[in-house]
Design a protein with these regions (language model features):
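Nucleotide-activated chemistry modules centered on ATP-dependent adenylation/adenylyltransferase
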Residues: 1-310
Length: 310
């Protein structure tokens, strides 16, 4: 009888760390999209998740340039620090950036301002029309499953119909990291390369890689006011109202979106280590703690996704 003996060579037994495994998965997804699609685009707002996506895309194709265009839906109520960071990064890497302006749609009479002043729900029309105009067939987004329940059930490759609408019943199985990008003319696929990352993973990776972030993510003094339990930034977008009082507090932002619906959190975390410690101790997701637009209804995010939102 022949006996086969398995020989293990420690030199070839390298085990990927948790962060290395997540990075490898994301890099694979970027390369898969580059091979399957003709006109991919990365949604890039200058927020931490889109910054992470761009960093991973740069790694996936280095030393060649990133073969994707960037797209930002500008509400006109974005944080100035984040826009400045966005423009600096685009210039630094010689990237192409398309900006779809909500203000342009309001000026043209295609959209109306909401009574509460927020423009976050108004992003859907500029986004979907930009996708149609530029014929993008794959759209990278920074959504993560730990953020919100609608995002938790969405696939990495998320098929959208010719109206950019999402139907959860049309989702495809994704066994063994095999992704099906097939779509009919006029349809496109939303792609979420960091879907399996948590907020803590994101920050630990940012620390490991030495990725620069806008200062808004670290504790600083800011003039804010309280609305429905959230500390919102005072500004030109229409806040605060007459009965709302502003005060100066030391805060930071866990997630960044429209100023009118993104709440700051009290914090003294001025370094990456301090932020990571703070997040590890938190029992609330970043969107659950700081996004007013997710509190409009129990299914607010899923309703917007069905209409074409990120």
């Amino acid at each position: 009888m022949t006996v086969f003996t398995r020989v293990r060579n420690p030199a070839h037994a390298r085990v990927l760390s948790h962060l290395d495994s997540l990075e490898s998965e994301a890099v694979h997804i970027f390369r898969e999209v580059a091979g399957e699609f003709e006109r991919p685009v990365i949604l890039f707002s200058g927020g931490k998740d889109s910054i992470l996506m761009l960093h991973l895309a740069l790694k996936a194709f280095a030393p060649a340039p990133v073969p994707f265009t960037l797209l930002h839906v500008d509400t006109g109520h974005n944080f100035p620090e984040v826009l400045a960071y966005r423009d600096r990064v685009v210039a630094e890497h010689g990237l192409r950036l398309h900006v779809a302006s909500v203000q342009d749609y309001i000026d043209a009479g295609k959209l109306r301002e909401r009574p509460d002043g927020t423009r976050n729900p108004l992003q859907t029309v500029p986004l979907t029309e930009a996708i149609q105009q530029h014929r993008f067939d794959a759209v990278f987004g920074g959504g993560r499953r730990d953020e919100e329940k609608a995002r938790a059930k969405e696939r990495v490759f998320s098929l959208r119909d010719e109206f950019s609408q999402w139907d959860p019943r049309r989702q495809r199985p994704e066994l063994w990291q095999l992704y099906n990008g097939r779509h009919a003319p006029g349809e496109h696929v939303r792609v979420f390369p960091i879907s399996n990352w948590t907020e803590l993973d994101v920050w630990q990776y940012i620390e490991r890689e030495g990725i620069e972030l806008p200062e808004i993510y670290f504790a600083h003094e800011r003039e804010v006011f309280n609305r429905n339990g959230m500390w919102l930034t005072a500004g030109h977008w229409g806040g605060p109202k007459e009965h709302e009082r502003t005060e100066t507090r030391q805060v930071r932002y866990r997630t960044v979106g429209d100023m009118s619906c993104t709440g700051a959190v009290d914090s003294d975390a001025t370094t990456l280590d301090a932020v990571i410690t703070e997040i590890a101790a938190s029992r609330l997701t970043e969107r659950g703690a700081t996004r007013a637009d997710d509190k409009m209804s129990e299914a607010a995010m899923e309703d917007r996704k069905r209409e074409g939102y990120f």
